[in-house]
Amino acid sequence: MSCARRHAVLAYLGERAWTQGVTDELPEVPRDSLLSARVSAARLAQLARWELDRARRVLHAVEIPMIALKGVAYLLRGMPHAATRLLSDIDIMVPRSSLAEAEKLLHAAGWRATNLDPYDQRYYRQWSHEIPPLQYPGRILALDVHHTICPPVSRLRPDPEAFWAASEAHGDSGVRVLSPVDSVLHAAVHLFFDSDFDGRFRDLVDLHELLAAFSADDAFWHDLVSRAREQGLGRPLYYALQALSRVLGTPIPTATSREALGFRPPLPVALWMNRTLAEVLAPIDPQRWPPAHRGRLWLLYVRSHWLRMPAHLLVPHLVRKSLRKGRQYSADV
């Protein structure tokens, strides 16, 4: 239970137990823990819908279009696993041309930037794919406003206009969601190119559930590979399919796996990455980590930064972050 809680899948397990009708067979303590997690996740899902609607009203008033991303988008789609995610923020995307106006309007409506450090402000505005996170005073969920899904200085540079063109309207609310294949590719990018890997099993579960939901469409797998090739996102898709197969046993059509090999890095790199990703993404209690586990996490952390920024920006960025951590440690001591 502690491992499931650490990896933020306790509510997910509770939902699975409930839908399979085995809840009453569980001992009282774990049953109560699963129920509590489901209730907490459902409450956060309710807050996420409300927070999204507040932002929608502000932007819709001046006809700024908006795409809901990740967790809140899964809620809008009514995906079964969506209400089991422990959300800490909601993510939206607006056109780059409307970004400054959107930020100004949200500030006027009461949202405030949560990070006022001058360097971090510069980092977000010059090199990131989003503005600094916003928070409405007294509310739980932060608001992340994107203009694309990858940093503009990163090695992955998909065309955001293509995402807009393929996006789908959610009823008559004015909110849009990414197409099924773009939703999967965004989740793959977020996990395999845009974050560290400690405690990311939850994100792998997201990908598993997305594929389970969308693959009912006969054209999905072909469209997924084609879209990855078109947007230059084949490498994260390759890693995603490999990790899903190895860690969760997600069924991947043979033809799709074969096509995805065209996105594979050189064989020695692929062998190391596939083995390492399977190890660090597995839901293992930190007390049982093998000796080399922390070293692998560190290498993947450096890799994610290397992919997000060119060397002339990355080196001073990491030096600055290290110095800041050193000062924080000294202050704490």
Language model features by range: what are they?
Residues 1-88, 94-333:
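Conserved NTP-donor binding/palm subdomain of two-metal-ion nucleotidyltransferases/polymerases, i.e.
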